[in-house]
């Protein structure tokens, strides 16, 4: 272990502590935003929802569905009674319930096409982020997508910017992330759906989609006989409540955006600490 001057060690120590403190503050703001959302909609813990089944004495879960409610879906998981309870609860105290695809909520929902990837050296490529890395603040980038060969696809389907909302569409379906500033211009896998939010609602959209209630509605849309997945159309029809109290909705939005900025500042401090350590190792 290299022994650095005390002043340098203290600088690195302070930067790491400040970085973790900012992460904690960010997480607290996200929790605060979701708590406000639950309070405004008067939502119970989702585990306290106990759906009613058709026959309680049958020995197995059973329920009926009206033909008019099939929505071209014959898979039982789409029609589970708890889903109806979730929709009823988010609707009860909302001004209205619309969908993520509503033009007031999102400008665009992008599902990239499947393509053969060409990876290159970092100076010739764009950082490429896979679905399994999307929940990390500072994912280790090992692959760079060719700028030359994938220029159009990167611009139209893969490139992300601060406050885009990402949803995993396979694997662990329904993971949600809001893009931090240091991911600007990165390319994100075609296995992640990108939502370009309308101005002034990105934070609220993230707070809602990352809730247990939204997760139930996201996973309701799963389809596939071999590989479970969702797509851009699935995300577009996910119900989302609009709050009666616009001030509360704006506050939720602001809390999340502040939290996202804190995550970025935490990243910068962490990088500063790493750079100082590298200077010690290289001298």
Task: Locate predicted features.
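A generic structural signal for residues embedded in beta-strands
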Residues: 167-168
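Non-catalytic DNA-recognition/assembly elements of restriction-modification systems
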Residues: 4-115, 246-283
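Sequence-specific dsDNA recognition surfaces
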Residues: 101-117, 132-162
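Short, surface-exposed beta-edge/turn micro-motifs
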Residues: 123-126, 162-164, 191
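Basic, amphipathic alpha-helical recognition segments used for DNA target recognition
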Residues: 1, 7, 135, 140, ...
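A short, polar/charged loop-to-alpha-helix boundary motif
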Residues: 178
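Short, charged beta-turn/beta-strand-edge "cap" motif at the junction between a beta-strand
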Residues: 171-175
